């Protein structure tokens, strides 16, 4: 008799009669035709699959918020319930569910788990409507689904129980009285539901009342009834549960037990069947007691009896789950019994014998483990996450079963429901093998867009005590190492985010001109595969140390070359924008062909902060990368004495630590200079380098003209005296740093000749710029006068404000006693590569405004790199024709400051003052006259205070007094009395701020450039290793249909193609479509220009401790403060509710509530600003 064949007018009467007779055992029920699942998500789909296998029509219900959920689509039919109701409430509308079932001729309803699955009133409503409830009868549910009633039944059946309240309680006072009688710890549990909802352990009497309120609220929200019961807490138990099946003929069997001891907040995380290492005697008694209890109450259908087993083997009944369990899967895997099919067929009236299920035939084979993959962030206390799944790839293969619902790319994880995404079940011959399969499967998962607990699950599975099966419910609490995660790299998706950002919003690195990077592939000279670099000068340094290294340099015939192409050349010509990507590409050729170089300058100066600020790459990683590719040539960097890589003075311990780390990472030669030639600053840098084991190249910044007798400040005597002090300070190499290129050939001959005569044993190294056009001639004179090393840039990166041409110097010295030993053929190939590569940096090309050098540098003495910047600024402001005036004013500013040494940061001081004078139409005389009333640039004030150091000939007066107006002065070395930085404390603070383990190098970058580092770190976490992208794509992105291969590491290459860019949606976003490794992916990018019109909720700013945001998406359930309130640190501010979990958010600081941005009831996204506290 099928219900569907009965005319609708009589259907309800027949159904009621049928069900009553069925319940009383009078008639044998017939087969179902249509079965509804009153649930959602993966359990609904699990039941649908069973119905399909049994050739039955599956029917889904769904809430409005679940309109796009997969369970609605998987069913044969689906109907909306709870229209206009909150998301969870829709699945609790018994009347609407029954009405829908009657309307569509539903024969039976399967409740799944959660929601109404343990509500006896729902089972009764089904019965009254003539619909079969697939589960226990209403009276059994009322008794067993109610945990207190189930406890009483256990006592009646002779099963030992844990001390607890005799019935549900609804007031905190009752909980307090129980705690007083039995002592703490106690546990509060929801009386009408499970899944960890409404459960709290309480260790102190004074905490009972607040815990009761929270548990009651959670239970009310999850199950529609906040009643709780209280039990004495059993210490260190294992959580063992027994799976039961009972028919309507009085037969009952067990399907053995499961171990659910791995729990968090009383919610199961990992389940195992059968329970490993459970003593056989205990197992048999537990199974027998579970059957005894089930027979005592006349249990029907599927259910679970749960026990706590203590360390001595004593066990206590805790509850019955009168429904199917989430972890039923592991029992199915070890017994081969389809529990859901069995449920349905038992509800149809079949006996266990009909199903060929008897205790004797039910056996276990092997072991099974289930892991619940959830959208929770274990690094943040398992905060639920929600949002769009951008990427989903599962782990599969032999021994792996996946039960899921919303696990696919494009799926939106709602904040309204449970965070379970997919259940992964691994089965094998034994527990360790099952764990190995599970580890393999979880490692293959790729889920992007939402956080998951997979890293935590992997740590659990690898933990020795888990593998030894010696875990109890304290397992997670007692193993903090489970929360030590290796951050997910997520490189591919982050790079897509970057390319999408560039496509929608344009370059992330500001482009200096309208020129576009050329579409070129720079030619890389051929190198035989596996060829090892020949021996170079670095081998001497590594084997014999800095002192012997210096002797070796001095003893070698000829003049050696330092190649500045990797640093100062592009700093001068291309705004310091050359990326590691392009340096690394040519590095193997450099190692093979230029082993005769003295050094390769590739680090320091402006490159350090620019690499983070504009190129979004780590300067330390650049050093590490190049060191691996060029092991044979010494690396050279520019060290600003007490400024290190920065622009201000740092405490000494920062300088020393920086040098230590630089040497550790592969730096060899440190050109130590000071922007004022201030000896105390120089000595700090020299001592730090020497202590670290680096080569100390003490540099004297050159200015003026030693051949001009009228310029008596920086004469030959000045340089010889300073050089004498540096040599006495144990410099390994003496350097002349001509940063403006004002060292004329004749001056070079005089100065270098005098230094060589006075210091015959120390190597001399000369650096210059070719701004005047006389750089090659000057370097040739240096070589002839006794210089051991001169600086040059490869031909296509030389000239103008860069260094002189390497090819020109090498060719000019060939065949002489100063021969460099370098090959012009190799230089030609090297130059061809950089000529092509330079076109990629067209947006930063100085040649757009600068067409040649200019000998007027001998007057204004502007350093090479600064000259380029000043000229570009002038042209960009429409002052190109007045650039000569800008240069003239630079000279005036220098003179008014006392004719100082000009190199970063002192050159910036002169530049700032020059612009200030131009803007205010000042001359040298009027500046001094009006100084009392002018607001000078900060850099000028700092200089006058002595914060940069002491000029060789003192500060200009009365200008200094007028500028300072009583401000304090520093008379000695600025950093001498600076408090050491607690680098360990900084590391802890940074790791807390950025949420990952940071290196010593990261801490050092922050110590010198705190804001730049923070922004770089935030950028990299969002967009990944953009340094792996080819330069043109990094700067301007992909064109539609363009493809690119991106090697993210050796043997791992991403194939990326940009497919399309979507239209603007109502959230101000555009969807950008990519093909990644043959699979389509899409991301949503906020159109920053269009979104200016869209009102959004303010965001909590990272690093601002008074900004307290929503740590997860959810609703503001309760505000515990109001504006103007004084709050203490860790005082509760508000309660957030998400995924049926409540979280109390505390204040991280003491202060006053400045503003509440999200009133009670507000729906928040993760990171939305809720409360603002003013310290």
UniProtKB/Swiss-Prot annotation:
Substrate binds at residues 567-571, 640, 904. It comes from the Eukaryota. Keywords: ATP-binding, Biotin, Cytoplasm, Gluconeogenesis, Ligase, Metal-binding, Multifunctional enzyme, Nucleotide-binding, Pyruvate, Zinc. Pathway: Carbohydrate biosynthesis; gluconeogenesis. Residues 31-481 form the Biotin carboxylation domain. A divalent metal cation binds at residues 568, 737, 767, 769. The active site is at residue 323. CDD domains: biotinyl_domain, DRE_TIM_PC_TC_5S. SUPFAM superfamilies: Aldolase, Glutathione synthetase ATP-binding domain-like, post-HMGL domain-like, PreATP-grasp domain, Rudiment single hybrid motif, Single hybrid motif. Residues 1099-1174 form the Biotinyl-binding domain. ATP binds at residues 147, 231, 266. The modification N6-biotinyllysine is found at residue 1140. GO terms for molecular function: ATP binding; metal ion binding; pyruvate carboxylase activity. Its EC number is 6.4.1.1. GO terms for biological process: gluconeogenesis; pyruvate metabolic process. It is an enzyme of class 6 (ligase). Interacts with sir-2.2 and sir-2.3. This is Pyruvate carboxylase 1. It comes from Caenorhabditis elegans. The gene is pyc-1.
């Amino acid at each position: 008799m099928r219900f569907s064949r009965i005319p609708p007018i009589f259907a309800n009467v027949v159904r009621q009669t049928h069900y009553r007779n069925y319940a009383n055992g009078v008639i044998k029920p017939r087969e179902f035709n249509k079965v509804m699942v009153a649930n959602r998500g993966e359990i609904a789909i699990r039941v649908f699959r069973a119905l399909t296998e049994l050739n039955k029509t599956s029917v889904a219900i769904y809430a409005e918020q679940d309109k796009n959920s997969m369970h609605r689509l998987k069913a044969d039919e689906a109907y909306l319930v709870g229209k206009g109701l909150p998301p969870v409430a829709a699945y609790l509308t018994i009347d609407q569910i029954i009405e829908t079932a009657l309307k569509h001729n539903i024969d039976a309803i399967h409740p799944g788990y959660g929601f109404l699955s343990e509500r006896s009133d729902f089972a009764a409503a089904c019965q009254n409507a003539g619909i079969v409830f697939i589960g226990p009868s209403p009276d059994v549910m009322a008794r067993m689904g109610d945990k207190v009633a189930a406890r009483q039944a256990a006592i009646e059946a002779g099963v030992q129980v844990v001390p607890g309240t005799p019935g549900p309680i609804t007031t905190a006072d009752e909980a307090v009285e129980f705690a007083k009688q039995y002592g703490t710890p106690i546990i509060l549990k929801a009386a009408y539901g499970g899944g960890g909802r409404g459960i709290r352990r309480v260790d102190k009497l004074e905490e009972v009342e607040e815990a009761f309120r929270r548990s009651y609220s959670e239970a009310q929200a999850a199950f529609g009834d906040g009643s709780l019961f209280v039990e004495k807490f059993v210490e260190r138990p294992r959580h063992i549960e027994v799976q039961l099946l009972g028919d309507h003929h009085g037969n009952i069997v067990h399907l053995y037990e499961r171990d659910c001891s791995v729990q968090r907040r009383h919610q199961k995380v990992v389940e195992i069947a059968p329970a490993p290492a459970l003593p056989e005697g205990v197992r048999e008694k537990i199974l027998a007691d579970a059957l005894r209890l089930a027979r005592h109450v006349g249990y029907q259908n599927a259910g679970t009896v749960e026990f706590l087993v203590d360390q001595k083997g004593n066990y206590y009944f805790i509850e019955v789950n009168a429904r199917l369990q989430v972890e039923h899967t592991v029992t199915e895997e070890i017994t081969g019994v389809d529990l859901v099919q069995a449920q349905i067929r038992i509800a149809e009236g079949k006996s266990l014998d009909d199903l060929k299920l008897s205790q004797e035939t039910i056996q276990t084979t092997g072991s099974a483990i289930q892991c619940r993959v959830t959208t929770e962030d274990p690094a943040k206390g398992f905060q639920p996450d929600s949002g769009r799944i951008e990427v989903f790839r599962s782990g599969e293969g032999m021994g792996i079963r996946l039960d899921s619902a919303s696990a696919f790319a494009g799926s939106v994880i709602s904040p309204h429901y449970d965070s379970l995404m997919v259940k992964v079940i691994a089965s094998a011959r034994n527990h360790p093998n099952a764990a190995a399969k599970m580890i393999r499967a979880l490692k293959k998962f790729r889920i992007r867009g939402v956080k998951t607990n997979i890293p935590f699950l992997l740590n659990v599975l690898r933990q020795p005590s888990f593998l030894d099966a010696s875990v109890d419910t304290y397992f997670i609490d007692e193993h903090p190492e489970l929360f030590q995660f290796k951050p997910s790299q997520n490189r591919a998706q982050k790079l897509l985010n970057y390319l999408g950002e560039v496509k929608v919003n344009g370059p992330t690195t500001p482009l200096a001109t309208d020129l576009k990077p050329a579409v070129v592939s720079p030619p890389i000279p051929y190198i035989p595969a596996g060829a090892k670099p020949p021996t170079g000068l670095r081998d001497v340094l590594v084997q014999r140390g800095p002192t012997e290294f210096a002797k070796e340099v001095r003893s070698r015939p000829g003049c050696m070359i330092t190649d500045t192409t990797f640093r100062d050349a592009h700093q001068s010509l291309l705004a310091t924008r050359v990326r590691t990507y392009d340096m690394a590409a040519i590095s193997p050729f450099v190692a093979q062909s230029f082993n005769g170089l003295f050094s390769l300058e590739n680090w320091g100066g402006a490159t350090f902060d620019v690499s983070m600020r504009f190129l979004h790459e780590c300067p330390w990683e650049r050093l590490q990368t190049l060191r691996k590719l060029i092991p044979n040539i010494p690396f050279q960097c520019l060290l600003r004495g007490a400024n290190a890589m920065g622009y201000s003075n740092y405490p000494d311990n920062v300088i020393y630590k920086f040098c230590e780390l630089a040497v550790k990472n592969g730096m060899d030669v440190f050109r130590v200079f000071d922007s004022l030639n201030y000896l105390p600053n120089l000595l700090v840098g020299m001592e730090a380098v020497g202590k670290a084991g680096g080569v100390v190249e003490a540099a004297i910044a050159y200015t003026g003209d030693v051949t001009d007798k009228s310029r008596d400040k920086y004469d030959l005597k000045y340089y010889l005296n300073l050089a004498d002090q540096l040599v006495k300070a144990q410099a390994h190499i003496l350097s002349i740093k001509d940063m403006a290129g004002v060292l004329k050939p004749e001056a070079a001959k005089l100065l270098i000749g005098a230094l060589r005569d006075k210091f015959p044993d120390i190597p001399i190294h000369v650096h210059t710029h070719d701004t005047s056009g006389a750089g090659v001639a000057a370097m040739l004179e240096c070589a002839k006068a006794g210089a051991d090393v001169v600086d040059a840039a490869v031909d296509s990166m030389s000239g103008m404000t860069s260094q002189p041409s390497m090819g020109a110097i090498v060719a000019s010295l060939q065949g002489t006693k100063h021969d460099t030993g370098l090959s012009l053929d190799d230089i030609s190939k090297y130059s061809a590569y950089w000529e092509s590569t330079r076109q990629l940096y067209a947006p930063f090309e100085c040649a757009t405004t600068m067409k040649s050098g200019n000998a007027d540098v001998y007057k204004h003495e502007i350093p090479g790199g600064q000259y380029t910047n000043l000229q570009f600024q002038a042209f960009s402001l429409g002052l190109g024709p007045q650039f000569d005036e800008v240069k003239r004013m630079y000279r005036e500013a220098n003179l008014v400051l006392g004719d100082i040494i000009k190199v970063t940061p002192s050159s910036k001081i002169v530049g700032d003052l020059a612009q200030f004078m131009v803007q205010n139409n000042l001359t040298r005389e009027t500046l001094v006259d009006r100084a009392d009333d002018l607001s000078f640039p900060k850099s000028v004030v700092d200089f006058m205070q002595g914060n940069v150091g002491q000029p060789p000939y003192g500060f200009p007066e009365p200008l200094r007094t007028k500028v300072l107006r009583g401000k304090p002065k520093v008379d000695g070395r600025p950093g001498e009395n600076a408090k050491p930085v607690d680098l360990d404390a900084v590391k802890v603070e940074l790791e807390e701020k950025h949420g990952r383990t940071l290196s010593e190098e990261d801490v050092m970058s922050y110590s010198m450039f705190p804001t730049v580092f923070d922004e770089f770190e935030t950028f990299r976490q969002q967009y990944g290793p953009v340094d792996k992208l080819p330069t043109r794509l990094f700067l301007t992105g992909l064109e539609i249909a363009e493809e690119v291969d991106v090697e993210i590491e050796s043997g791992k290459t991403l194939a990326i193609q940009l497919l399309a860019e979507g239209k603007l949606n109502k959230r101000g976003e555009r969807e950008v479509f990519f093909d990644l490794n043959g699979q389509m992916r899409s991301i949503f990018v906020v159109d920053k220009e269009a979104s200016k019109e869209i009102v959004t909720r303010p965001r909590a700013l990272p690093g601002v401790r008074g900004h307290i945001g929503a740590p997860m998406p959810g609703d503001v359930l309760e505000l515990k403060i109001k504006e103007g309130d004084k709050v203490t640190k860790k005082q509760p501010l508000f309660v957030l509710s998400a995924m049926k979990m409540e979280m109390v958010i505390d204040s991280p600081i003491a202060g006053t509530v400045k503003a509440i941005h999200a009133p009670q009831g507000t729906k928040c996204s993760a990171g939305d600003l809720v409360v603002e506290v003013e310290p």
